[in-house]
Structures are given as structure tokens and as C-alpha cells.
């Protein structure tokens, strides 16, 4: 089993894939952060910050008196964002923990599900919270990943193969549903959670970028391992570009808890 993050930040379309996810999920993330009552001047950490879209939104929220630490193992998309409010750090959270007791908010989205060391990482994130600080973790649960209208066996076959291929590489497609219990086990209080399945309609020109680009990046491994064949891949891509295809994305489970 791999111990490394599965998806390659150097892949030619990785920024497009990440951007498509930010368009789906950033509004919900910020709505939750506002609900938690993050004040101006707060100290925040965005772990596995990707393109930095949430880090930028946090910087606007906390204002010039606040601080946002944006970390990732590859900071090519983050480096241009560094300024007086946003500090960019190349950091592997599985090896280097955040400073203890420093942050009013720590946020990680679509990260822990990929890490075999997820329980240890979650515990270290909890240690990074200042008293009263919030930890917000958001990951996908694949319970709705094969919901498509009109029904499509090949779409379901490729989606299932993708899920199980990633599982074989250390990904946990059911981790998100355990997050509330994991947050409580980390010694945090005021645990809460919500689950949302976003409906996505196919686009003839763009397809369904979050899922089409995920499968495209994983395609070499899927094909080489016999998880799917070229006919499956071509049919999946065609379905993603049929204008009458409507899917429900995997459940985004957002869980939060506070350090007393």
C-alpha cells in the first residue's frame, strides 16, 4: 500500500481538476466557516491548500490583522498568493506537524481521505488548535458516487473501479462518515457534521470536470491493472459529455469540532 498522496500535482490538467472542485465546494466551505463564527484577526491554517482558493477566502475574512498559513507538499499554485496575510509553506503534514496551540481555525478538505496516516494527522491537527479554536475537516463519502440519470452501467463500473483502485493505494472512501467520532476521539468538543451531495449536469464541451479529470489522471494505473479497458474509458468520457446526463457527486461530509 502506498503511503503517499495518490494524485500528482505535476499532471498537466491538475489545476483544472482542482479548480473544478473549488467551484463546487468553496461556497459551502466558507458558509460553514462563517457559521463557526471565525472573527476578524483570527489565525488560520489551510492544510493541503491546493490552488489556495480557500486560503484567499480566509484571508479576506480575517482581514489585515489576521494570518493564514497555507501548506502543501507542492506549492506551485500557492506561491503567487504569499503576502502580508498569507504565508505559504511547503510541508508534508504526515511528517511535520503544525505548531502546537496556535490556530483559531484549521481546515483540511479532500486530504485526510487520501492519507493512510490519517488518524495520526488528525490528532496532530487537533494539537495545533488554540483554546477555543475550530478544526473543520471535509472529505468525500462515495455513497452517492454511482447515482446517475439516466442509469449507466458503464459509468457505475468505471466509478467503482476508480474507487477500488484508489482504495488499493491507501485511499479510504468511507473515512468521511467516521469523522465525527474521530474528532471526539482526538479530545475535541462541540462536534458537528453535515453531508451534501451536489448535483452536476454534464456539459457537451467540458464534460463533468471533477470526475472526468480524476479518471483521466488515474487512467494509466486503471488500464495497466485491468480495472477498466479502453472501451470503458471512452464510454465513460462520452457519458460525461452527454447533455442529458445528471449525476450526484459523492457526499461531501463536513465535520467540525472545537478545542475546549
Where are these regions (language model features)?
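A short acidic, Gly/Pro-enriched loop at the edge of an enzyme's catalytic core
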Residues: 96-105
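Class I SAM-dependent methyltransferase SAM/SAH-binding core
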Residues: 45-96
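Conserved Class I S-adenosyl-L-methionine
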Residues: 174, 191-260
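A short SAM/SAH-binding and catalytic strip from SAM-dependent methyltransferases
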Residues: 104-118
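Conserved alpha-helix/loop element of class I SAM-dependent methyltransferases that forms part
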Residues: 23-40, 57
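Conserved catalytic/acceptor-binding region of the Class I
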Residues: 136-204
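Class I SAM-dependent methyltransferase Rossmann-like catalytic core
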Residues: 3-26
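A short glycine-rich, Lys/Arg-flanked "PGG" loop and its adjoining helix->strand segment in the class I
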Residues: 119-134
Amino acid at each position: 500500500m502506498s503511503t503517499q498522496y495518490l494524485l500528482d500535482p505535476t499532471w498537466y490538467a491538475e489545476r483544472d481538476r482542482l479548480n473544478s472542485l473549488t467551484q463546487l465546494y468553496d461556497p459551502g466551505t466558507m458558509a460553514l466557516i462563517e457559521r463557526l463564527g471565525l472573527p476578524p484577526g483570527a489565525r488560520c491554517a489551510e492544510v493541503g491548500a491546493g490552488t489556495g482558493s480557500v486560503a484567499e477566502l480566509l484571508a479576506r475574512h480575517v482581514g489585515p490583522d489576521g494570518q493564514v498559513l497555507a501548506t502543501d507538499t507542492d506549492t506551485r499554485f500557492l506561491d503567487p498568493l504569499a503576502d502580508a496575510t498569507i504565508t505559504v509553506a511547503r510541508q508534508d503534514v504526515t511528517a511535520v506537524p503544525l505548531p502546537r496551540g496556535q490556530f483559531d481555525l484549521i481546515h483540511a478538505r479532500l486530504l485526510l481521505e487520501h492519507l493512510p496516516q490519517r488518524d495520526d494527522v488528525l490528532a496532530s491537527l487537533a494539537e495545533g488548535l488554540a483554546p477555543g479554536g475550530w478544526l473543520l475537516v471535509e472529505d468525500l463519502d462515495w455513497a452517492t458516487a454511482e447515482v446517475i440519470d439516466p442509469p449507466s452501467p458503464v459509468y457505475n463500473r468505471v466509478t467503482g473501479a476508480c474507487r477500488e483502485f484508489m482504495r488499493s493505494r491507501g485511499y479510504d472512501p468511507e473515512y468521511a462518515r467516521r469523522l465525527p467520532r474521530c474528532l471526539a476521539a482526538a479530545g475535541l468538543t462541540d462536534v458537528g457534521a453535515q453531508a451534501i451531495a451536489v448535483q452536476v449536469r454534464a456539459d457537451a464541451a467540458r464534460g463533468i470536470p471533477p470526475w472526468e479529470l480524476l479518471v483521466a489522471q488515474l487512467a494509466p494505473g486503471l488500464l495497466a491493472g485491468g480495472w477498466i479497458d479502453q472501451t470503458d474509458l471512452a464510454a465513460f468520457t462520452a457519458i460525461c459529455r452527454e447533455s442529458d446526463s445528471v449525476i450526484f457527486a459523492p457526499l461531501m461530509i463536513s465535520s467540525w469540532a472545537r478545542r475546549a
